[in-house]
Design a protein with these regions (language model features):
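Alpha-helical transmembrane segments and their membrane-interface exit regions
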Residues: 57-68, 148-151, 170-177
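Membrane-interface helix caps and helix-loop-helix hairpins in membrane proteins
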Residues: 40-53, 71-76, 104-111, 131-135, ...
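Membrane-interface capping segments at transmembrane-helix boundaries
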Residues: 15-16, 69-71, 177-187
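Membrane-interface transmembrane-helix boundary segments in multi-pass integral membrane proteins
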Residues: 110-126, 152-174
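A loop-to-helix transmembrane entry motif
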Residues: 78-87, 106-120
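Early transmembrane hairpin module of multi-pass membrane proteins
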Residues: 1-53
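Central hydrophobic cores of alpha-helical transmembrane segments
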Residues: 139-150
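Alpha-helical transmembrane segments of multi-pass integral membrane proteins
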Residues: 29-41, 55-66, 80-98
């Protein structure tokens, strides 16, 4: 909901707003990301998991390139729209890989599902912190904190270690979000 609303606002503003520099920087990549998004929905709906992962990777790469191109912008709407979108797709890509592994009944190389979940949370946290810093975009972290909060709520009754890991990861990402906003105001 929020991502599509922000993307809709981006579409409206690009026609109404006086600042077209950011729109030109993004260029055709926005259309590419939209095509990948639509294809992913179709692949996921029809449970074409290997294909859905490939399409998701295409979406992820297109969003990375968009975020590279807008790293220097001060336009908050553009940073928020594509930052939140990238953060969500980073986490969704990890979830898509996990779904594919479960589909193929991967045994986790002898490591428990609980430990693998903790590892995936930590990988998501590290990728998010690096992305916030690389793209100078604190918005990337917001959807990741949201995802980690969802994990905490879902797992609170059964896996305390997962809940604690997700909470710590959310706090660390939150720290970098705040730090990035502060640095943006005081360069």
């Amino acid at each position: 909901g929020v991502i599509y609303l922000l993307l809709l606002l981006f579409c409206i503003v690009q026609f109404l707003g006086p600042n077209h520099t950011e729109v030109v920087r993004i260029g055709w990549l926005f259309a590419v990301s939209a095509v990948f998004n639509a294809l992913w929905i179709i692949c996921w709906h029809y449970e074409k998991l290997p294909l859905s992962l490939l399409v998701m990777l295409g979406l992820l790469v297109s969003l990375i390139f968009i975020n590279i191109r807008i790293a220097g912008t001060s336009n908050m709407l553009i940073k928020a729209a594509f930052g939140i979108y990238l953060g969500w797709i980073c986490i969704a890509t990890i979830a898509n890989v996990t779904a594919l592994l479960v589909h193929y009944q991967w045994n986790g190389a002898g490591i428990s599902g609980e430990i693998w979940t903790i590892v995936m949370i930590l990988i998501g946290m590290v990728i998010t912190v690096l992305a916030i810093r690389k793209f100078n975009n604190p918005w990337i972290g917001l959807s990741v904190v949201w995802a980690f909060t969802g994990i905490m709520i879902k797992r609170q009754a059964d896996f305390r270690s997962i809940v604690v890991t997700a909470a710590i990861a959310a706090l660390i990402v939150g720290f970098f979000i705040i730090k990035s906003f502060i640095l943006a105001k005081n360069p």
